[in-house]
Swiss-Prot record:
GO MF annotation list: alanine racemase activity; pyridoxal phosphate binding
Similarity comment text for this entry: Belongs to the alanine racemase family.
Classification via InterPro entries: Ala_racemase, Ala_racemase/Decarboxylase_C, Ala_racemase_C, Ala_racemase_N, Ala_racemase_pyridoxalP-BS, PLP-binding_barrel
Cofactors: pyridoxal 5'-phosphate
Annotated residues for binding of substrate: 132, 309
Listed Pfam families: Ala_racemase_C (PF00842), Ala_racemase_N (PF01168)
Record carries keyword Repeat: no
Name of the molecule in the record: Alanine racemase
Organism: Carboxydothermus hydrogenoformans (strain ATCC BAA-161 / DSM 6008 / Z-2901)
Catalytic residue list: 34 (proton acceptor), 261 (proton acceptor)
Protein function: Catalyzes the interconversion of L-alanine and D-alanine. May also act on other amino acids.
GO biological process: one example: peptidoglycan biosynthetic process
């Protein structure tokens, strides 16, 4: 096995799902396992969550749904993103549920389904303030028209929050009001759908009025909080992924020794330069050059020089005992020290979501 790997603790994911269900109460939880389950491995995570009681899943794209089916997972799967109408046959074959988010798309689906003499279940997306895909909440006539199309059966209607992870929840509450306008209109017209849903991880924790029939846990399943503005006491989450590598070489070098491309790191004293066999092609951000930290022997050590495509170097005190083959942790816990995805995100100038989903296919996932 490659001396770089990500350990995924499935029991921690199951624990986090239990926290979701505790918060959701009567609403059903639909785990979001898009982007390879946020880098954790969609198939393995889905199987673990099914064992914990999950009955349906959400993904972003058609291929993610197909991968689940090919792995033998037959639970309902909602595709949250855009699926072109020419993929209708695949949706039918794999029994996947698309999202319809504008009138022209729905009509194109209806035309193909009519020709095939088939009916397809779908969920209707409402834009209440995200400004992304979806019928604008005021387009009530178009929404009603689509919901009455033949060969298409609306199983659900949903929206997505733009700012539920911020300290100020006023915009999220406005989005709830807008979504309720649509729901009340449909009820007045005698149009019923089985599932109404809106809540992402932040809303699951902070906006119980947004739980409706389904909630869509994403980042919290993997032990991460949506932002620093979401109070930690709302849910006890356990991070599920640890990124590890084995030391490839140790060099004892004098003061004035330069390291990596551009010689941007120069030792100020005698130092151990420890090489690790992973780099930005594995999803370890180049922006962590001379900024990131690595755990070796349960202590924090700084990245020395620029992160390379396939390797990086760490500056360790010359008195430390480090040997080739020793284990280093780049994300997660070693001893009493922890490097969090949020900490890494702050250094890079991004969010913890990107830290996790950026871990590339080259890194084997090991399930513990």
């Amino acid at each position: 096995m490659r001396p770089v790997w990500a350990e995924v603790n499935l029991e921690n994911i199951r624990h986090n799902f239990r926290e979701v269900k505790r918060l959701a109460r009567q609403a059903e939880a639909m785990p979001v396992i898009k982007a390879n389950a946020y880098g954790h491995g969609a198939v393995e995570v889905a199987k673990a969550l099914i064992a914990e009681g999950a009955k349906r899943f959400a993904v972003a794209i058609l291929d993610e749904g197909i991968k689940l089916r090919e792995a033998g997972i037959d639970a309902p799967v909602l595709i949250l993103g855009y699926t072109p109408p020419e993929e209708v046959e695949k949706l039918l074959f794999y029994n996947l549920t698309p999202t319809l988010h504008h009138r022209e798309l729905a009509l194109a689906y209806q035309e193909r389904l009519e020709r095939l003499k088939k009916t397809l279940f779908y969920h209707l997306k409402i834009d209440t303030g995200m400004g992304r895909i979806g019928f604008w909440y005021e387009e009530l006539e178009k929404i009603e028209e689509v919901l009455k199309l033949k060969n298409l059966e609306a199983e659900g209607v949903y929206t997505h929050f733009a700012r539920a992870d911020e300290q100020d929840l006023s915009f999220s509450k406005l989005q709830i009001e807008r979504f309720n306008i649509v729901l009340k209109h449909l009820k007045a017209k005698g149009i019923e759908v089985k599932y109404r849903h809106a809540a992402n991880s932040a809303a699951i924790m902070r906006l119980p009025e947004a739980h409706y029939d389904l909630v869509r846990p994403g980042i919290m399943l993997y032990g991460e909080y949506p932002s620093r503005d979401v109070p930690r006491e709302l849910a006890h989450l356990k991070p599920a992924l640890t990124l590890k590598a084995r030391v490839s070489q140790v060099k004892k070098v004098p003061a004035g020794f330069t390291v990596s491309y551009g010689s941007t790191y120069v030792t100020s004293k005698a130092t151990l330069i420890v090489s690790l066999p992973l780099g930005y092609a594995d999803g370890y951000f180049r922006r962590l050059s001379n900024r990131g930290v690595v755990l070796i022997n349960g202590k924090r050590w700084s990245i020395a020089g620029r992160v390379c495509m396939d390797q990086l170097m760490v500056a360790v005190d010359e008195t430390e005992r480090v040997n080739p083959g020793d284990e280093a942790v780049l994300l997660g816990k070693q001893g009493e020290e922890t490097i969090t995805a949020m900490e890494m995100a702050d250094l890079v100038g991004t969010i913890n979501y990107e830290i996790l989903t950026n871990i590339s296919y080259r890194v084997p996932r090991i399930y513990v």
